[in-house]
Amino acid sequence: MAGRYFEEYVPGMVIRHSLGRTITEMDNVLFSALTMNTQPLHINEDYAQKHSAFGRRIVNGIFTLGLAVGISVPELTEGTLVANLGYDNVRHPHPMYHGDTLYVETEVVEVRASRSRPDQGIVRFRHTGRNQD
């Protein structure tokens, strides 16, 4: 599916993305290695079992964020985005584990003309990721 254009967005619009993605151990370990994140909660099962509140390794939260945004791309911005201006208010209220499947829904929070580029618009999204439960 191709992304939507500025004129197609309306504040309050909610898109439940059709894609879901199961997170594997390899996803988590490779992402942690590529980003040089040596946090043992992500890569050391023995440590996580003995020293974490979760009792096992958790998926790197930044991987989860990136995956959530990626899941949204085909139905939101694929081929239509000029630039991603940033993220704010990122929270990880619950851990993701190896074998969890991430599903995402996006709410359109704001749609407005750009002040610095009058021929372009700005759309603010609220992405919410959830596991299979």
Q: Where do the protein language model's features map onto the residues?
A:
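Hot-dog-fold acyl-thioester-processing enzymes
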Residues: 1-86
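HotDog/MaoC-like acyl-thioester-processing domains
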Residues: 1-11, 92, 96-133
